[in-house]
Each structure stands twice: as C-alpha cells, then as structure tokens.
Amino acid sequence: MITGATLDHVAVAAERWEDAWPRYAGELGGRWISGGETSGFAAHQLRYDNGAKVEIISPHLVEHNDFLRRFIDRNGVGPHHLTFKVPDIRAAIAESEDAGYRPVNVDLDDPYWKEAFLHPKDAPGVVVQLAQSSTEWSSPAPAGIPAPVHDRTATLDRVVHAVASLDEGLALFVGLLAGAEVERSENWVELAWDKPGRLRLVEGHSDWIGPRRGRVHHLAFTCPWLDDGPVTVEPEDNLGTRLLMFPG
C-alpha cells in the first residue's frame, strides 16, 4: 500500500482548452488555478467549490510527443487519467511493482514534479498517474476564459468509474492507493482520501465498458442553482464526458 496517497484530480482530454471552458468554467464555475504547455500536451486546472479539481489537457507539440494525440485519435475526447499525489515517488513505484503493476513513463528528473503511470491494461481501464510534488502551482488566467454564470460554484462530488470487476478495482484503489471505503451498496463502493472528491467504483454497465476492464462513467456535481434534478449531460454533448448534475 502507498501510504499517504491522495486523489488529486481527474483529467479530461479535449482538442483545445477553449472547447471545455463554457461548461467547466462558465456553467459549473470552475476557478482557474494554473496552466502550462510542454512537449505533447497543454494542461490547465480548475477548482470547484469543495476544492476538487478537473484538469483539461489538449495536444501540443505532438511532433515531439504524440501520446495524447494518439489517445484522442483512438478513443475520442473525454476522461483520460486520475492523478494521485504520493509523498515518495520511488517508494510508490516499488509498492506498485510489488503489487504486480507495471509503472511506465517514469520521469524522476524534474525536481518539482516526479511522476509515473499505471497503464489502463494493468489498472481497471483508466490511466493512473502517480506524482510527487510539494509545489502548489498557480498562473494567471488566460484571456477569454469565461466568468462563472452562477453566483455559486458547483462542487465536484465524485468520479464514477465503471469496472468489470469490483474486486479488481478495489485491489488497485484500496489495496495499493489506500482509499478508505465510506459507502457501499450491492454493486458499488465509494472511496475517499484526505482531499476533496471521491471515487465510486460501480460493477456493471457492460454496454458502456464494452471489452475494456473499466471506463469512467461520469463526473457527479452538486449545482446550487438547480431546482429540479438530477440533470444528465451525455458524453456527446460534453466533449466525451458524461456529467450528472444534482440540485443542492
């Protein structure tokens, strides 16, 4: 088990940052934290009312690194990875290997951000990023990002991840990544860490998962401006990511 692991954010792939702004910044009220560009992708993060974060990533300088371009060409836009912050990346890599996972794309060169990934073929259908960083990044918001439409920001309550095997999902997210079980039903388990936002593993949804071992099903938000609900925004209407929006 990776002691001290915490769920930091969910990352969503889009062709351009700007494509995601009307929904995630305007309607849901995500507040800009930081953004930047590097070989292969550009990323920026938005924070919601409870502190939970969404990262939008888009292809950039793909001639140097085309991993995200290939992902979008193969799968379309939508959920890409879950990032877990860890206190010691080398220990986390060793724990992962001991548990039978194969860390890939290990990068320990940057003194401010060290990372490794667990491939979705090893994990239940989602890329898991392990990252060590003591820095809280911030940067000026870019021109053109919309102001929140509503007076209050939504809260990002949970990421709901459909899995073919609940036991397999728990082996990763509890056995390795130290999630604490906070709720359980017949076919799902909800996990929490010491940061905002939760992960709910749901067994089933074979029509959505298809031949995969798992797939992010939706992001659940509480939206104070809703009087009736919940409201479902289907993937085709939100850049490949389903949203469930609940009144609150």
Model-derived features: positions:
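Core segments of cupin and vicinal oxygen chelate
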Residues: 2-5, 11-53, 91-114, 118, ...
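Residues that form or immediately flank small-molecule/cofactor binding pockets and catalytic motifs
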Residues: 37, 61, 108, 135, ...
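Generic hydrophobic/packing signal
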Residues: 60, 83-86, 97-100
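A short, polar/proline- and glycine-enriched secondary-structure boundary/capping micro-motif
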Residues: 65-69, 139-142, 181, 211-213
